[in-house]
């Protein structure tokens, strides 16, 4: 078992070194928040980029840029200061199952939040304790908070899942990785300081799940919260303080299809 862990560790470290470079950014949805410098712009652009992240990455990036254009490329200012008439431009916006109703609710929730809060981080951390092992309660709180406004549309709930419903929460875990992790390559932002890297849970992308099974990090095939925790624990055996950094390695190799 120790030999297997050692071999897997060497493979993951090698893959991480290969893919953890600024060139990773260009063709990934994380390129969307990288267009901005203001913290709140990064948060809003990052949230939409993460939520839109299923399917072809080029399409995801194009749709994100379309949305940013409708927000005059100033998402924080738009969210904060828009008027009802400004929302008409979104009536034809759609990305797969994410439709106008969903978008308008997102904008409404974000406007409500930023009226009272400096950062979107608090929407997660208000549900957490500093000694929590992971972000499970933060994600559950974010879900409840996101749909606490009157007349919140039921259909939008599928875009903000929660661990309590056994969702792997892939997109939100990816968003948290972007906001929390800080390291030298400049891929992730590290602008949130009240959630620690060791509390993050690995985003369970289809490529990540496949490669994790090939490397025998996990054996299960089902993509749910339990599996996400199992994979994260396996990665903690390799790097207990920053396990989710290996998401970049697993995803990068899975997408590239190249040999180790």
PLM features: what roles do these ranges have?
Residues 1-260:
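HhH-family (HhH-GPD) DNA N-glycosylase catalytic core used in base-excision repair
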């Amino acid at each position: 078992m120790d030999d297997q862990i050692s071999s897997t560790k060497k493979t993951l470290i090698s893959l991480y070194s290969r893919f953890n470079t600024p060139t990773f950014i260009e063709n990934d949805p994380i390129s969307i928040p990288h267009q901005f410098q203001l913290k709140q712009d990064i948060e809003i652009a990052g949230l939409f980029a993460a939520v839109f992240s299923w399917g072809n990455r080029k399409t995801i990036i194009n749709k994100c840029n379309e949305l940013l254009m409708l927000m005059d490329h100033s998402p924080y200012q738009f969210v904060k200061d828009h008027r009802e008439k400004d929302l008409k431009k979104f009536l034809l916006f759609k990305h797969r199952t994410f439709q106008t109703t969903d978008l308008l609710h997102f904008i409404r929730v974000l406007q409500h939040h930023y009226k009272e809060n400096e950062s979107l981080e608090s929407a997660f951390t208000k549900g957490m304790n500093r000694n929590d092992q992971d972000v499970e309660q933060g994600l559950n709180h974010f879900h409840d908070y996101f749909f606490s406004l009157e007349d919140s549309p039921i259909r939008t709930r599928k875009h903000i899942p929660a661990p309590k419903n056994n969702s792997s929460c892939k997109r939100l875990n990816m968003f948290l990785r972007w906001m929390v992790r800080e390291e030298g390559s400049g891929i992730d932002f590290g602008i949130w300081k009240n959630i620690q890297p060791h509390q993050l849970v690995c985003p369970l992308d289809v490529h990540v799940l496949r490669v994790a099974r090939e490397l025998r990090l996990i054996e299960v095939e089902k993509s749910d919260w339990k599996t996400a925790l199992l994979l994260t624990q396996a990665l903690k055996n390799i790097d207990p303080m920053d396990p989710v950094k290996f998401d970049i390695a697993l995803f990068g190799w899975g997408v590239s299809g190249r040999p180790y």
